[in-house]
A protein has these predicted regions:
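Conserved beta-strand-loop-alpha-helix junction that forms the acyl-donor binding cleft
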Residues: 107-117, 133-139
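Conserved acetyl-CoA-binding loop-helix of GNAT-fold acetyltransferases
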Residues: 77, 83-96, 118-122
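Active-site acidic-Proline motif in GNAT/NAT acetyltransferases
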Residues: 64, 78-80, 84, 111-112
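Conserved GNAT acetyl-CoA-binding A-motif
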Residues: 98-109
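Conserved acetyl-CoA-binding loop of GNAT-fold acetyltransferases
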Residues: 121-130
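Short hydrophobic/aromatic beta-strand or adjacent loop that forms the aromatic wall/cage
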Residues: 45, 139-143
Length: 149
């Protein structure tokens, strides 16, 4: 598996499988607007993909230079690749790139997504806030952060 930057057209095409998964499905995310956003972020060099044999297994989208750190705006792993270290590898790459210049790495997760909470805790993130209405009016996001070693 390799981690590489993604071109805008390829980033846009990932939206279909992302919106079919939780938590994006129950939050009402739609493929076309998400695809446009992914394409814009890719043009800015902010989309990385985990690739194996030319297949994208997962992607991470970052927003650099946020609050003395980098914010992981989206992390998604294809269901068939879950549990194979794809998410861990993507976060590790973002950590490496971010911690070279920044003090913090941030991410948020839906408070209902207990698997995400376990995942981020296991990677050394600490929960720092609950943010009602950040992504959807009826949902609560949990803000996580990790300090540069």
């Amino acid at each position: 598996m390799t981690i590489r930057r993604v071109e805008p057209a390829l980033a846009r095409r990932q939206a279909d499988w992302i919106v079919a998964m939780e938590p994006w499905l129950s939050m009402g995310f739609r493929a076309v607007p998400l695809g446009r956003w992914l394409s814009r972020r890719a043009r800015a060099g902010c989309v990385l993909a985990a690739v194996h044999k030319r297949a994208i297994l997962g992607i991470v989208v970052i927003q650099p230079e946020v609050l003395l750190g980098t914010f992981i705006a989206l992390l998604a792993v294809r269901p068939q690749a879950a549990g194979q270290g794809v998410g861990r590898a993507l976060v590790a790459r973002v950590e490496h790139d971010s911690f070279a210049q920044r003090r913090w790495l941030y991410v948020s997760s839906d408070s209902r997504n207990l698997a995400a909470a376990r995942f981020y805790r296991k990677l050394g993130f600490e929960r720092v806030a609950r943010l009602p209405g950040l992504v959807c009016d009826d949902r609560i996001e949990v803000l996580w952060r990790k300090r540069r070693p």
